[in-house]
């Protein structure tokens, strides 16, 4: 992995610890990668690129507090056919350096537009999980000409509001055993995460940084898209939900998505909770690739 320098801000001890654990998590990355920063109107955005440089682009957006390192069980398969760009979402706990992040849906879409432009991406497939799925949906509704197709996994809100249990478990993260309790809840008591990655997640919880925890905004996230917004989607979408999803009822979310989004394939995956790309990576990797291949005519 090669790193391109950027102006890293002064960090607290917990911030330094987080950066160290992030780098340790990259040891789980099974393929060669390049880590670098790109400039946007909203700050320096950290990206992990893998796969052939001349392959079609695929942009990955992670879940909240998980960062781009969460894709370690998936990246080998996806980067075998695509130039993958795992993007650290601005304003979340990761290596991106936020500046002037208002937290509105418009600004988040413009941030991704800057990312695409500065990576030289005219049009790309996208994959987003949880918070990343919400960002993906927001972007493809506003900039459909830049998205070939999108796999949206366990999106945060998007189709349904959070169950009230989400806030109970999220607010308990900093308590004794709060991280373990939260992760077990999210994954139906089958925490499959590598201990190195869990260490990074814990370090992120302990790193209190206001610029990386934007306040909820009526014009921002979380957000449930209206019927009209969902009907306006012009991009092919694959929606994957775990049968043990806890942030909302997966069957109700699938029903609403299928009722309003014009071009959508939707599926509930067995033996998976919220973090299904890490819980059932073999199936998710293949299912997503099959969807993209059908959209572009690429054969396995």
Curated annotation (Swiss-Prot):
Entry keyword Hydrolase: yes
Site entry (Transition state stabilizer), positions: 130
The enzyme's E.C. designation: 3.1.1.1
InterPro entries: AB_hydrolase_1 (IPR000073), AB_hydrolase_fold (IPR029058), AB_hydrolase_sf (IPR050266)
Active site: 274 (proton acceptor)
Superkingdom of source: Bacteria
Coiled coil, from the record: none
GO molecular function terms noted in the UniProt entry: carboxylesterase activity
Pfam families per UniProt: Abhydrolase_1
Keywords, alphabetical: Hydrolase
Catalyzed chemical reaction(s): a carboxylic ester + H2O = an alcohol + a carboxylate + H(+)
Quaternary organization: Monomer.
Recorded family membership: Belongs to the AB hydrolase superfamily.
Protein's name in the database: Uncharacterized carboxylesterase nap
Organism: Bacillus subtilis (strain 168)
Lineage per the UniProt record: Bacteria, Bacillati, Bacillota, Bacilli, Bacillales
Primary gene name: nap
């Amino acid at each position: 992995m090669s790193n391109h320098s950027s102006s890293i801000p002064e960090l607290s001890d917990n911030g330094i610890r987080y950066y160290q654990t992030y780098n340790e998590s990259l040891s789980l990355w099974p393929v060669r990668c390049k880590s670098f920063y790109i400039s946007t109107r909203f700050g320096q955005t950290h990206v992990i690129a893998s796969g052939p440089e001349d392959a079609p682009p695929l942009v990955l957006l992670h879940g909240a507090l998980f960062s781009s390192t969460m894709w370690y069980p998936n990246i080998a398969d996806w980067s075998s056919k695509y130039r993958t760009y795992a993007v650290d979402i601005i304003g979340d706990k990761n290596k991106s350096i936020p500046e002037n992040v208002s937290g509105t849906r418009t600004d988040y879409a413009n941030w991704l537009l800057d990312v695409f432009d500065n990576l030289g991406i005219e049009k790309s497939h996208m994959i987003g999980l949880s918070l990343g799925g919400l960002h993906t949906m927001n972007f493809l509704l506003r900039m459909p000409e830049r998205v070939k197709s999108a796999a949206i996994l366990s999106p945060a809100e998007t189709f349904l509001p959070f169950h009230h249990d989400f806030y109970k478990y999220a607010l308990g993260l900093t308590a004794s055993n709060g991280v373990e309790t939260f992760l077990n809840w999210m994954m139906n008591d089958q925490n499959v995460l590598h201990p190195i990655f869990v260490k990074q997640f814990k370090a992120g919880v302990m790193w209190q940084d206001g610029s990386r925890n934007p306040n909820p905004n009526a014009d921002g996230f979380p957000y449930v898209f209206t019927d009209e917004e969902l009907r306006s989607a012009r991009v092919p979408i694959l929606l994957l939900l775990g049968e043990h999803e806890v942030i909302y009822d997966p069957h109700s979310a699938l029903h609403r998505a299928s009722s309003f989004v014009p071009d959508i394939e939707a599926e509930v995956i067995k033996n998976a909770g919220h973090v299904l790309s890490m819980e059932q990576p073999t199936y998710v990797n293949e299912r997503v690739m099959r969807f993209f291949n059908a959209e572009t005519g690429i054969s396995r």
